[in-house]
Amino acid sequence: MASFVAGQQGKEPAFESYPVRVESKTARAIDFRNSPGASKFRTRLREAIKGDVNFAGRYIISGWGCGSGCSQMAIIDAKTGRVFMPDALAGVSAWYYDVEDDYEVYTYKKNSRLLVVRGAPGPMTDGDTEQEPGSYYYEWRPNRLRLIKFVPRPKPKNA
């Protein structure tokens, strides 16, 4: 699947191509009972649920560091309080060379199902991921991320 996605040609996916209606938040607390793994991040998730919807119409994305050059994220359903922790967000190793000044590891919008991750996503093993660094374009489907395109990182100018 990854080689198929990496081999796709054409423009990078646009947020406007994945529209969604923004709903109001109704959850007041995190549903730890139905959110495997979420209890390890209680403080961060409890703070996040206090905020407004910021992704895919009814979700709140929250993130935290997991070491030098590493970050993790969770997606909270703002209607139910349930937390989703996709493997792709369980330790993104960021890359920093040959990128624009306004570089962001994660890019998302509250009115779009598109999530862009720049780095090497996936669970960290021995301080590294098995994924190739680059820009990963995911579509949020009910309760999961679907990889729709991968663009390898640019080679360093000095290489």
Task: Locate predicted features.
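Structural signature of eukaryotic scaffold interfaces centered on beta-propeller domains
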Residues: A48-N54, D102-N111
